[in-house]
């Protein structure tokens, strides 16, 4: 019902992208759980958020089974069974399966719009803090402003091709799941960070944009030559999460990527500062340009 929390623990697959729409459209609040957390932390989040439903990829069966042993609130479990991978070693967690559950839905259902723009749309939890994770509530107004603002700040065109690299549990994928629908974008999902697979998807779907932490960019520039594919067009990249070495910008540009460094927090819906390029800097020496690009705003 309206205001209930629906948790989801999944990779960047279509199910978690769909959840960013389906859950708010029934008036509920999406809680995307970090897939790298241990059972005790997951258990804490499920209890603290008072989750009523948990949608979970079966690959996390071990973590979830252990987590649920300490959860007192009753939770309906819906399993995600990814047909694109071998799931034979994954245990069944809940009694419901995602696609089968969708087939029981009402085609004539009229989605519930928020009565107030300050109503919650998402509940996220910080990581890397002392003690238990801290809950951060996003409201519809803030998510809307972040989604539209990102499109403007990054000069994103209509009908772009976006590769989902940033985990959607991280600040709701920096709010891009909502931005992309506004821009009629093609969304390409990436289950796991695999550089060879990334280059294949970039080539196949003519990817124009993606975001990623500096560690991902480091994997790209240091990947074996046989795993790298020549880019057909420039690919725009946002990076955040840690200070990237300036040399990363130079190496990424040589491969055909244009990188912009941004900064944000879970509490700010994702990135709020960016290093907007000044054309006057084009005449600077290479090292100086890379130094400027490494700034966060």
Identify what each model region corresponds to.
Residues 103-108, 122, 136-157, 165-169, ...:
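Conserved structural elements of the adenylate-forming
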């Amino acid at each position: 019902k309206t205001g209930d929390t629906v948790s989801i623990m999944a990779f960047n697959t279509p199910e978690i992208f769909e959840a960013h729409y389906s859950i708010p459209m029934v008036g509920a609040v999406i809680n995307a759980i970090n897939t790298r957390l241990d059972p005790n932390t997951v258990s804490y989040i499920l209890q603290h958020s008072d989750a009523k439903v948990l949608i979970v990829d079966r690959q996390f069966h071990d973590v979830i089974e252990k987590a649920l042993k300490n959860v007192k609130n009753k939770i309906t479990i819906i399993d995600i069974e990814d047909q694109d991978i071998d799931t034979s070693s994954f245990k069944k967690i809940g009694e419901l399966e995602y696609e089968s559950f969708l087939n029981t839905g009402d085609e004539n259902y009229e989605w519930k719009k928020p009565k107030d723009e300050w109503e919650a749309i998402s509940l996220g939890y910080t990581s890397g803090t002392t003690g238990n994770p801290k809950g951060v509530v996003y409201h519809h107004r803030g998510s809307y402003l972040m989604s539209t603002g990102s499109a403007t700040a990054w000069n994103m065109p209509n009908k772009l091709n976006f590769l989902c690299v940033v985990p959607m549990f991280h600040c709701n994928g920096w709010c891009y799941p909502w931005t992309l629908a506004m821009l009629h974008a093609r969304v390409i999902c990436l289950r796991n960070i695999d550089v060879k697979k990334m280059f294949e998807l970039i080539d196949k779907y003519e990817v124009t944009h993606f975001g990623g932490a500096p560690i991902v960019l480091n994997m790209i520039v240091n990947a074996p030559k046989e795993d790298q594919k020549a880019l057909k067009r420039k690919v725009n990249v946002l990076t955040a999460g840690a200070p990237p070495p300036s040399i990363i910008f130079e190496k990424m540009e040589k491969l055909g990527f244009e990188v912009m460094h941004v900064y944000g927090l879970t509490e700010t819906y994702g990135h709020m500062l960016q290093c907007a390029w000044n054309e006057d800097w084009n005449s600077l020496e290479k090292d100086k340009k890379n130094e400027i690009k490494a700034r966060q705003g």
